[in-house]
């Protein structure tokens, strides 16, 4: 039977990726414990475990499946497989963090591989991830390139065979939560472009497919169990980063991700849990994230964010302001001049607000919560973070104060 255009497209992606595989050879393969959570995901499990062993290109692994009270025959199916599976049968739907932590406690492997049940592997994925881990220094995690599968429904069809995950970055949002994580290059059809087809350090990988040394996982306390299906992988990545471990994105470990198979089904409950996850994350990591993003922007590393420093100046233009704008632009910052004192809508992109007028109602601005507020004045004003009088070298003096105070 002839293959459909969609099957041919999928096969072309798989065949193309084969050309990039390292096919690592190991003197001794370390044991990898593959941890999978599932809840009524029989159809996902059948896809995941089709030719599972032959696709790994790696022989030394065990599988630990955490079943969260399935009633669709998942347990019976898992028990029928001729694979090294250990089954944890829960009587309730435990969180992603708790399920993985419970499995990690009984894992025999030197490495833990967190894997969603809605993943469809392609050849060589596990060999690639382990090889990447062993051939880089100070690695805390290795993530994979995840691709959306083909979707038949019109609403989702546009994202078919596009990138779902190629590392995580952050961007500004006009919410109290200050910054939002996103998958870089998401929905791109350029699956093998140079930007996403080389190993690189990222701030975070998704835990949909994540390799971690068990010792590091345990030393950092595993996944934080205060989350429920959201932000726990980013939280763990920040623990790695804070402890000077690298998170590496390996694009040659390529898998299809059919998305969100073991989450809460009630929409209102999902929204509530998502809100609680966000609030907990930013209460825990908000200050650290602000500092790291600010450093990233000033140094233009494009590691955590792709954005530049954004500065809004509340003032009419004059000789002093004109020079200040020029000096800040020379630092390759985005600078916007706002001459209207009644304009309070600063926007979510603004990092630094500079006011040349003490009558500006800075307490009522519409912006992110954590922007730095500067008043051009020789008098203190408690509404502002920095008060600095005019000088010929104002831009440099201001940035020195900001770097000393915040970085």
Residue ranges and their predicted role:
Residues 1-31, 191-192, 265-310, 391-407:
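Non-catalytic membrane-proximal stalk/linker segments that position and tether the catalytic domains
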Residues 50-60:
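Short, acidic, metal-binding catalytic loop of nucleotide-sugar glycosyltransferases
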Residues 67-76, 92:
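A conserved acidic beta->alpha catalytic loop
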Residues 90-107, 123-124:
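Glycine-rich, basic loop-to-helix element that forms the pyrophosphate-binding segment
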Residues 97-98, 171-215, 219:
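A recurrent flexible, glycine/aromatic-enriched loop bordering the glycosyltransferase active site
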Residues 112:
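Short aromatic/hydrophobic "clamp" motif used to bind/position activated sugar donors
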Residues 119-176:
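Conserved donor NDP-sugar-binding/catalytic core segment of glycosyltransferases
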Residues 124-129, 195-221, 226-254:
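A short, conserved alpha-helix in the catalytic core of glycosyltransferases
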């Amino acid at each position: 039977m002839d293959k459909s255009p969609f099957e041919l497209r999928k096969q072309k992606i798989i065949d193309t990726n084969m050309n990039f595989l390292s096919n690592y050879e190991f003197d001794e393969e370390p044991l990898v414990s593959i941890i999978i959570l599932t809840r009524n995901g029989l159809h996902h499990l059948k896809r995941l475990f089709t030719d599972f062993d032959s696709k790994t290109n790696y022989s030394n692994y065990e599988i630990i499946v955490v079943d969260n009270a399935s009633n669709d025959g998942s347990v019976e199916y898992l028990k029928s497989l001729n694979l090294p599976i250990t089954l944890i049968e829960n009587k309730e739907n435990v969180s992603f963090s708790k399920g993985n932590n419970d499995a990690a406690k009984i894992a025999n492997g030197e490495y833990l591989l967190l894997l969603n049940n809605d993943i469809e592997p392609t050849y060589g994925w596990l060999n690639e991830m382990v090889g990447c881990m062993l051939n880089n220094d100070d690695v805390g995690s290795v993530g994979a390139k995840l691709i959306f599968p083909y979707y038949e429904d019109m609403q989702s069809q546009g994202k078919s065979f596009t990138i779902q995950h190629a590392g995580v970055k952050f961007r500004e949002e006009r919410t109290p939560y200050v910054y939002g994580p996103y998958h870089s290059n998401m929905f791109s059809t350029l699956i093998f472009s140079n930007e996403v087809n080389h190993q690189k350090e990222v701030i975070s990988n998704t835990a949909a497919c994540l390799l971690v040394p068990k010792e590091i996982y345990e030393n950092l306390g595993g996944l934080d169990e205060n989350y429920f299906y959201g932000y726990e992988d980013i939280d763990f990545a920040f623990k790695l980063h804070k402890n000077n471990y690298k998170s590496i994105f390996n694009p040659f470990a390529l898998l299809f991700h059919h998305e969100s198979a073991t989450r809460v089904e009630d929409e209102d409950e999902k929204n509530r849990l998502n809100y609680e996850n966000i609030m907990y994350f930013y209460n825990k990591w908000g200050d650290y994230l602000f500092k790291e993003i600010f450093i990233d922007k000033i140094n233009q590393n494009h590691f955590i964010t792709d954005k530049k420093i954004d500065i809004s100046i509340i003032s009419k233009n004059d000789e002093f302001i004109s020079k200040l704008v020029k000096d800040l632009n020379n630092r390759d910052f985005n600078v916007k001049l706002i001459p209207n004192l009644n304009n309070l809508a600063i926007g979510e992109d603004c990092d630094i607000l500079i006011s040349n007028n003490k009558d500006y109602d800075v307490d009522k601005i519409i912006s992110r919560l954590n922007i730095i507020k500067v008043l051009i004045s020789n008098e203190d004003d408690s509404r502002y973070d920095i008060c600095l009088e005019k000088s010929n070298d104002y831009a440099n003096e201001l940035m020195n104060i900001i770097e000393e105070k915040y970085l």
